[in-house]
From Swiss-Prot:
Source species: Homo sapiens (Human)
Tissue-specific expression: Widely expressed. Detected in various tissues including spleen, prostate gland, testis, ovary, small intestine, colon, retina, and peripheral blood.
Subunit composition and interactions: Interacts with the prenylated catalytic subunits of PDE6, an oligomer composed of two catalytic chains (PDE6A and PDE6B) and two inhibitory chains (gamma); has no effect on enzyme activity but promotes the release of the prenylated enzyme from cell membrane. Interacts with prenylated GRK1 and GRK7. Interacts with prenylated Ras family members, including RAP2A and RAP2C. Interacts with prenylated RHEB and NRAS. Interacts with prenylated HRAS and KRAS. Interacts with RAB13 (prenylated form); dissociates RAB13 from membranes. Interacts with prenylated INPP5E.
Location in the cell: Cytoplasm, Cytosol; Cytoplasmic vesicle membrane; Cytoplasm, Cytoskeleton, Cilium basal body
Gene giving rise to this polypeptide: PDE6D
Disorder this protein is connected to according to its UniProt record: Joubert syndrome 22: A disorder presenting with cerebellar ataxia, oculomotor apraxia, hypotonia, neonatal breathing abnormalities and psychomotor delay. Neuroradiologically, it is characterized by cerebellar vermian hypoplasia/aplasia, thickened and reoriented superior cerebellar peduncles, and an abnormally large interpeduncular fossa, giving the appearance of a molar tooth on transaxial slices (molar tooth sign). Additional variable features include retinal dystrophy, renal disease, liver fibrosis, and polydactyly.
Name listed for the protein in its UniProt record: Retinal rod rhodopsin-sensitive cGMP 3',5'-cyclic phosphodiesterase subunit delta
Length: 150
């Protein structure tokens, strides 16, 4: 195992996604929240989100995470897949993470134009969000969450 692989394993071992919520960015109203650690690799997670989230112009996502390890440049790359085809790609950067810290990170996700939106009945169960967790260029973990619109 290379030093980079070992470093990625150390970071992952000490990393936990404590909770997450999604809000309507205009009203601040929480639309979904969960406490499952959606960062755990190797399993397909599931999330049931209200269909009205698809009507929001923008969604505010709040993540609360803990890390025992220092990270120089913590960031996420997310891809939204519909039936295996990548529809959207998002990039988020948190930056420096203090070792043995718990942090809350808020990000804004802008919706696709309404003309490009598919109905919840078509999307439900067919959308997977793949999240890659990085420390700068070091891939720490890849997780997948299948979305169901309820």
């Amino acid at each position: 195992m290379s030093a980079k692989d070992e470093r990625a394993r150390e970071i992952l071992r000490g990393f936990k996604l404590n909770w997450m919520n999604l809000r309507d960015a205009e009203t601040g109203k929480i639309l979904w929240q969960g406490t499952e650690d959606l960062s755990v690799p190797g399993v397909e997670h599931e999330a049931r989100v209200p269909k009205k989230i698809l009507k929001c112009k923008a969604v505010s996502r709040e993540l609360n995470f803990s890390s025992t390890e220092q990270m120089e440049k913590f960031r996420l790359e997310q891809k939204v897949y519909f039936k295996g085809q990548c529809l959207e790609e998002w990039f988020f950067e948190f930056g420096f993470v203090i070792p043995n810290s718990t942090n809350t990170w808020q990000s804004l996700i802008e919706a696709a134009p309404e003309s490009q939106m598919m109905p919840a009945s078509v999307l439900t169960g067919n959308v997977i969000i793949e999240t890659k967790f990085f420390d700068d260029d070091l891939l720490v973990s890849t997780s997948r969450v299948r979305l169901f619109y309820v």
